[in-house]
Amino acid sequence: MAGRFCQRDGGIMTAMVAVEILTECSQSSWNNSLHCGVFRHLPRNRPIIIGSSGEVFWVEYTLIAVAYIVQTHIMREYPSEFALALSHNVCVSISCAFVSLFVEENNPSAWIMRSKIMLICIVATGVVNSTSYVVESWTVRYKGAVFLAMFRPLSIVTAVVLGAIFLGDSLYLGSVIGGTLISIGFSVHNSLFHIANGFSALAKSSVLRHIGMLV
């Protein structure tokens, strides 16, 4: 059981890391593509999965996958979304405070909020992040980490589309197509996974029933 459990977690983590890496790498600019008929690629100095920048990507997305798995196990043992979100926010705040003290050691003015916009951004970020973490905790509690991971590319697609509509940002065709295809793939994988589990449970119950009849 332990070996099967570790294999399942390893597969989930690998799949989620692949989602993040593929979505990050499949960025090709779509600005003016309808007019010129060709896709304009991003500058060559964009970080890729090679060298120091690539190592940062791998570490970041691996830690995200591990965090989802740990979050799933915590929710199964202690099903309280708000308590988990509070603990998470306190730990993150303390960590950010220590990092900020180290980075801005010689710049005390960095701690001063110079406008109301900064305060509004801080409050909005706290509210949105806390709400999203509660929703994520609720999702992994009832659906598992795979279900949460398969919608992550769609969140990237949504952010890209809304940024292009309201902020005039570049729309990356790779993010739209790649995120959609990966999400469809995860949906199919999740459906097949549940079907396989159903057949496995049915076969197990059938075997136990036959054993009971023989006894």
Swiss-Prot record:
Which keywords does the record carry? Membrane, Transmembrane, Transmembrane helix
Q: Which InterPro entries match?
A: EamA_dom (IPR000620), WAT1-related (IPR030184)
Q: Which GO terms describe its molecular function?
A: transmembrane transporter activity
Domain EamA intervals: 65-186
| Location in or out of the cell | Membrane
Q: Which Pfam families match?
A: EamA
Membrane topology listed for this record:
Multi-pass membrane protein
Q: Which residues cross the membrane?
A: 48-68, 82-102, 117-137, 146-166, 176-196
| Cellular component GO terms, alphabetical | membrane
Give the top-rank taxon of the lineage listed in the UniProt record for this protein: Eukaryota
> Coiled coil where?
none
Which protein family is named in the record?
Belongs to the drug/metabolite transporter (DMT) superfamily. Plant drug/metabolite exporter (P-DME) (TC 2.A.7.4) family.
Q: What is this protein called?
A: WAT1-related protein At3g28060
